[in-house]
Amino acid sequence: MDPQQRLLLEVVYEALEDAGITLDEIQGSLTSVYCGCFTNDYNAMTTKDLEYYPKYTVTGTGNSILANRISYFYNLHGPSATVDTACSSSLVCFHLGAQSLRDAEADISIVVGSALHFDPNIFITMTDLGMLSTDGRCRHGDAAGSGYVRGEGIAAMVLKRQDRAQADGDHIRAVVRGTGVNHDGRKQGITLPSARAQADLITSTYERAGLEPAETTYVECHGTGTKAGDPRELRAVHEVFCRHRPDTLHVGSVKTNIGHLEGASGIAGLMKATMALEKKIIPPNMHFSTPNPEVDFKNWKLEIPTEPKVWEMGRRTIPRRASINSFGYGGTNAHAILEEYNSFGSKTTACQQPTVSLPPELAAMVERRPYLLPLTSHSERAGELWAERLAQYLTENEASVADVALSLSTRRTMHRFRSFAVSADMEKVIERIRDPPPGAAWKSKLDTIPRIGFVFTGQGAQWFGMARSLLEQCPLFLQTIRKCDRILQALPSHRPTWSVEAELLKSQQDTMLGRTEYSQPICTAVQLALVDVLAHWGVKPSGVVGHSSGELAATYAAGLLSFENALVAAYYRGVHMGSGAAAPGSMPGAMMAVGMTEAEVTAELEPYRGRIAIAAMNSPSSFTVSGDEDAVVELQQALTDRKVFARRLQVAQACVFVHSLVIKRY
């Protein structure tokens, strides 16, 4: 297989990771792939000896397979094509990728460029044509420019429609304002660039985008350093950008830094322009000392920077904007316009998220809580190496634990081997990433998803302080509890005079959790909120079981009752059961869990016939009894003296007993 194919697969994965798109998200999607390339050296090398002709040469080295291999490997269903227009190939691909999004042919577009050199014969033919530099330097705009230096590179970019990228919370680095492609047509020679055709293309691209060329402050030129190419391109740039501008236009070419990547050179220029927009710095050119005499830099208002320059906008209120130009030796020209993303009022972070205004209490909660940071890799050793790189990055760069946890949890593909770190403090996070505790050692994930069962309790298991830490540290849990309060306050009758949130936060002296009309809806609300939080984390039950009023939360988890219906049923159940205990003249009741068999319980209750009865069989050796409070207290003391498990439930009445006949109101 051509190394280009293997490297392209790797670079595409890195581009998706940078964009915050997981493999699960993109697999099977309507994603287009366009690959720009020029030469096919590996094929030329492997087919020199026809007696040794690999069986899979066609699929392993064919240029068309470069794009198709990516679509095949990642299971992408949009358009897939390899483009060869020589040096403008990848910028033409960029145009096609943007076009596929505009025409709704794709929801995502992956644009790649590739240039790997193995065959020395190509160097010879290019030297014969006078394309290559005689001194091994690419000198854009310089009098000593004699051609370009061939560079190697594999590059990838991911495109999305802006509204979709913002809605998905993707990492947006720049905005594409316009793209265009044309051809020189007939001219003096097929390899001779045309200033007129390039100027026409730039003009039409800006007109379609509804932009004014004079507002652009940087142009990334094709800039090969050839005697024929540079003067014509810079003349075209002057014609379009500088005739009506008051200031100087900065121009440059990444080829002076990394050489000419030929089929991948357009993407290299796009990447340079994107980073310049992000950093707000215009990068310098190398190997520029004496201006080319055929270029009137002063009167054309052009400047090639030789030192980094802060990208000042002066009094301009428009965003920073850059143009990227590229042309092939066969006459195909391409142009793209990029704009900084910050101009749209959104902050660019490690993982771009839609702007959300949180109440101060929720914002503080997000900052101070501990976070789970999942770590993942293809092997234990690879995971250890990656973890060290991550720890080094976090040491050298400022980042919040919340941001890092978000990126690792939702914007990274989960591979077979896993580890994790949990903390609210970045120093401890770094320490645990480098030296994970035994429970967080790198391990292979299970081949099958474990079956999880949820057990839901009824009243009596509540305790002072329950759910308080979740209310204080988990915004989703707090919001769900407040949703419960809104539902209860919207009831047409018998709406509560209290709130679930307030009751959970009361002091131990003031809490009313022991009263049935409070405990049943509150226990249900807490369990409903837990179901939603766990589901948000991706934890869903394979089976559920509910005990007593816990059946209501269980039916919600099973999808049999809606959230609102489960809560309202629990509330009215508690209201009517609690009203029995509060009725004038009603006898105080109690409930108790005992660790005995049915026969043993029956024998123990014989002296209390009519006063205590079995309320529930929890297991063959665990029963709940219910009855008059004084009788339950007496039985508890007797069992405790004999060291038999007996624990009072936190209820104020004897449910499932004669005391609860008031339920007939239903």
UniProtKB/Swiss-Prot annotation:
Pfam families tied to this protein: Acyl_transf_1, KAsynt_C_assoc, ketoacyl-synt, Ketoacyl-synt_C
Domains as described in the record: The N-terminal part acts as a polyketide synthase and includes a ketosynthase (KS) domain that catalyzes repeated decarboxylative condensation to elongate the polyketide backbone; a malonyl-CoA:ACP transacylase (MAT) domain that selects and transfers the extender unit malonyl-CoA; a dehydratase (DH) domain that reduces hydroxyl groups to enoyl groups; an enoylreductase (ER) domain that reduces enoyl groups to alkyl group; a ketoreductase (KR) domain that catalyzes beta-ketoreduction steps; and an acyl-carrier protein (ACP) that serves as the tether of the growing and completed polyketide via its phosphopantetheinyl arm.
Pathway as given in its UniProt record: Secondary metabolite biosynthesis
Keyword presence, Ligase: yes
Stated family: In the C-terminal section; belongs to the NRP synthetase family.
Induction description: Expression is positively regulated by the cluster-specific transcription factor pytR.
Active site location: C87 (for beta-ketoacyl synthase activity), H222 (for beta-ketoacyl synthase activity), H260 (for beta-ketoacyl synthase activity), S548 (for malonyltransferase activity)
Organism listed in the record: Aspergillus terreus (strain NIH 2624 / FGSC A1156)
GO molecular function: 3-oxoacyl-[acyl-carrier-protein] synthase activity; fatty acid synthase activity; ligase activity
EC number: 2.3.1.-, 6.3.2.-
A GO BP entry: fatty acid biosynthetic process
Annotated spans, Malonyl-CoA:ACP transacylase (MAT) domain: 455-665
Recorded superkingdom: Eukaryota
Gene that this sequence comes from: pytA
Name this polypeptide is given: Hybrid PKS-NRPS synthetase pytA
CDD domains, sorted: PKS
Role of this protein: Hybrid PKS-NRPS synthetase; part of the gene cluster that mediates the biosynthesis of pyranterreones, a family of antioxidative compounds. The first step of pyranonigrins biosynthesis is performed by the hybrid PKS-NRPS synthetase pytA that condenses 4 malonyl-CoA units ato the acetyl starter unit by the modular PKS of pytA. The acyl chain is then connected to an L-serine through the amide bond by the modular NRPS of pytA. A tetramic acid is formed and released from the PKS-NRPS pytA to give pyranterreone 5 with the help of the thioesterase pytI.
InterPro entries per the UniProt record, alphabetical: Ac_transferase_dom_sf, Acyl_transferase_dom, Acyl_Trfase/lysoPLipase, Ketoacyl_synth_AS, Ketoacyl_synth_C, Ketoacyl_synth_N, Malonyl_transacylase_ACP-bd, PKS_assoc
Keywords noted in UniProt: Ligase, Multifunctional enzyme, Phosphopantetheine, Phosphoprotein, Transferase
Coiled-coil residue windows: none
